[in-house]
């Protein structure tokens, strides 16, 4: 575990306009490194936001907002639970590294946390993309005092791309001889294997609202009537290959045709 890990955050924003038109633009980036030494963990995020407000007339105003964000997560192929479990149960008589530099033996199941926390075992990379848009219109009805109509539409798009590449790795054990020779042992999977997943999600939200507020002498009348419609759908596609001849080519078409799997699903809901 590292004593500290760097983090960064930066953003730039611009706003301005006039009485009838206002705008706000923002670009941002932030991220942090993992807590393991030579860590395969990392998180980066990049985003863009824009808000526009316009007063079209004395009775109509329009606002539009959009947000685009990408989240990039990088993980080792072993889970944090597995890594910390091995770290907690490590034996003081088993070295993390031999004096000659080779990685020490595992506790069991190939778990040597100084190796499984790095990209020596492969990687698990996940990218999430968000696009969120909202358009809103307010209309004050001039011939009906106190009546305002509001309509809004939201369109959201989400993509997720995951690529997980597991590859064999070597740990070294003492052969028990007086010459203190360490011998390699293959751990992990016998051959590299690749999992890829793609998720595509779309969401619509439409709403209409009529709001009436008016004071008559000592009495105030307020009535609100609205309706809303929503639709969501998602498509998922996944594929798996193994028996790669080399761990240098992490592409699906380089995997073997034996024991391959493909899968997919979709769903839709509305209200």
PLM features: what roles do these ranges have?
Residues 3-28, 32-39, 47-113, 122-130, ...:
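Flexible loop and strand-edge segments within Gram-negative outer membrane beta-barrel domains
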Residues 14-15, 137-145:
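Long hydrophobic segments that form regular secondary structure
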Residues 33-38, 51, 118-124, 136-138, ...:
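Extracellular loop and loop/strand-boundary signature of outer-membrane beta-barrel proteins
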Residues 48-50, 151, 206, 271:
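Extended, hydrophobic alpha-helical segments in both membrane/secreted and soluble proteins
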Residues 82-113, 167-190, 233-264:
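Surface-exposed loop/turn segments flanking beta-strands in extracellular/periplasmic regions
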Residues 134, 138-139, 155:
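Alpha-helical support elements that line or immediately flank enzyme active sites
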Residues 149-157, 222-229:
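Extended hydrophobic secondary-structure segments that form protein cores and membrane-embedded regions
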Residues 154-217:
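N-terminal start-of-domain structural block
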């Amino acid at each position: 575990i590292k004593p500290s890990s760097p983090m960064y955050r930066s953003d730039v924003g611009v706003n301005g306009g006039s009485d009838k038109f206002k705008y706000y633009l923002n670009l941002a980036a932030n991220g942090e490194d993992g807590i393991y030494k030579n860590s395969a963990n990392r998180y980066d995020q990049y985003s863009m936001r824009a808000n526009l407000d316009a007063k079209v007339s004395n009775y109509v105003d329009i606002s539009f907002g959009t947000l685009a964000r990408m989240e990039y997560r990088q993980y080792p192929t072993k889970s944090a639970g597995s890594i910390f479990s091995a770290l907690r149960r490590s034996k003081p008589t088993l070295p993390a590294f031999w004096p000659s530099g080779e990685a020490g033996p595992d506790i069991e199941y190939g778990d040597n946390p100084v190796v499984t926390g790095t990209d020596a075992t492969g990687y698990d990379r996940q990218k999430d993309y968000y696009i969120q848009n909202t358009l809103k219109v307010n209309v004050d009805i001039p011939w009906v005092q106190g009546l305002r109509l509001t309509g809004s539409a939201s369109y959201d798009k989400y993509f997720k791309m995951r690529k997980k590449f597991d590859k064999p790795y070597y740990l070294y054990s003492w052969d028990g001889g007086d010459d203190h020779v360490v011998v390699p042992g293959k751990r992990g999977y016998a051959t590299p294997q690749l999992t890829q997943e793609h998720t595509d999600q779309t969401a619509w939200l439409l709403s209409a609202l009529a709001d009436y507020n008016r004071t008559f002498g000592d009495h105030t009348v307020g009535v609100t009537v609205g309706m809303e419609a929503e639709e969501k759908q998602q498509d998922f596609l996944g594929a798996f290959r193994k028996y790669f001849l080399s761990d240098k080519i992490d592409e699906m078409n380089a995997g073997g045709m034996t024991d391959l799997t493909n899968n997919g699903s979709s769903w839709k809901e509305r209200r």
